[in-house]
Amino acid sequence: MFDNILEQQRIEKAKELKNLGINPYPHFLEKEMSLKTFKDKFSYILEQVEKRDESVNAVVAGRLKLLRIAGKSIFANIEDEDTNLQIYFSKDSVGEELYTILKKNLEAGDIVLVKGFPFVTKTGEFSLHASEVKLATKAIVPLPEKYHGLTDIEQRYRKRYVDMIMNAEVRKDFLVRSKVVSLIRHFFENKGFLEVETPMMHPIAGGANAKPFVTFHNSLGVERFLRIAPELYLKRLVVGGFEAVFEINRCFRNEGMDLTHNPEFTTIEFYWAYHNYKDLMDLTEELFALLLDKLNLGKTIEFDGKMIDFSKPFERITYKDALCKYGGLDRDLIEDKEKILAKLKTDGFEANEKLELGHLQAELFDNYVEEKLINPTFVSDFPISISPLSRRSDENSQIAERFELFICGRELANGFNELNDPLDQYERFLKQIEAKNAGDEEACEMDEDFVNALGYGMPPTAGQGIGIDRLVMLLTNKKSIRDVILFPAMRPLKSELKEKE
């Protein structure tokens, strides 16, 4: 650890500082203001003749990004969470003894506390003229050689802390993510929803069709599953009397990783008694309008080279109409299992002949429709067979009162009128068990306690989930989900695998 020559040199400098009575890791140094506040507060000097104000004695802090030694003076750039600032100090301003120590031992990556006044250099740069410079933290590992940051994308994800040090834009993206979560939370609170927390470890892998992570509870001696979705617990709360609830938290799915999938991801799920899925569409449009406004993005944003228009109302189209309009498929084809199988095989797509009609229609949708839904589009009336927790339509028992929101060819939200008939729910769980026994690893398991909860009566309720990660990808124009997750899942390095062997 810390055994290369550059790291060893820095360790020696840290030891030398200790010998000089300077702690390279002091327990507490208090800064007075951020660099942005310093710039904003003292920008008035730009309008003055002198372009300096020596009556100021402000204290700021930041990481050294660049040092330029010019004889008896040093110019340095420091950076904090928000911005950067040039600082200047000399033998005269900090004293010859301290200047000599700093000149010898300060390096890019070190964190410093600086006291001084604002001034403008001869080249016109707003700066801080330092009277005191204190080392707050000595960096042992040098920053990457390239000042503009890491170029290896894998290294950026594995060492996010270095990525954030070197790339201010990365920090800004995660500030946007934090703001998005905060805005969503306040939006639902202002609508009268109650934020709740439900279990992360479930006795049954349910709530959505996906392969779970399995763990073991030593004390109880039983298997537990990291939650796939919080849905069934949130609906239990509606049964219990909470009429509007939401939860922002992690979900886990033991599946592949790609540009839009990470094994652990963040969602908001919300349930609203005495409302229907059309109300959820209206609510979702309102939420997006708020986010775009508060983030100053306007009604049209760019994502992956495409311009997306968020003007209300969003397009609303049924599942089958979307197959015809966007998939270019005939109505008689999408209603005929044999014709669907033939179409899929002709176009080179895998087709399982054992799948029933609704699942085959889903294959059509995935292959011919989804990528064409660029502007926000609500697709409704899904096949009931792929919607095991949704309420059946009163007009057509083969249709679920369900919708999904697609933007730029990706699903962003899924909502439906909740199934509250306990007998119907029980029968659908039985069909899921049949599918699981037939080899469908993602099929739901029976949850008799949930069915029992429905037996006590759940009021007519609509529920929805929105993927926070994909939403932030959209709002920050990022192609990979790993760009919006601070510490995404990564494949083990070869060296890590060898150590385990």
Curated annotation (Swiss-Prot):
One of its GO terms (biological process) is lysyl-tRNA aminoacylation. Its cofactor is Mg(2+). Keywords: Aminoacyl-tRNA synthetase, ATP-binding, Cytoplasm, Ligase, Magnesium, Metal-binding, Nucleotide-binding, Protein biosynthesis. InterPro entries: Aa-tRNA-synt_II, aa-tRNA-synth_II, aa-tRNA-synth_II/BPL/LPL, Lys-tRNA-ligase_II, Lys-tRNA-ligase_II_N, Lys-tRNA-synth_II_C, NA-bd_OB-fold, NA-bd_OB_tRNA. Pfam families: tRNA-synt_2, tRNA_anti-codon. Binds 3 Mg(2+) ions per subunit. Mg(2+) 1 binds at E404, E411. It catalyses: tRNA(Lys) + L-lysine + ATP = L-lysyl-tRNA(Lys) + AMP + diphosphate. Mg(2+) 2 binds at E411. Homodimer. Belongs to the class-II aminoacyl-tRNA synthetase family. This is Lysine--tRNA ligase. It comes from Campylobacter jejuni subsp. doylei (strain ATCC BAA-1458 / RM4099 / 269.97).
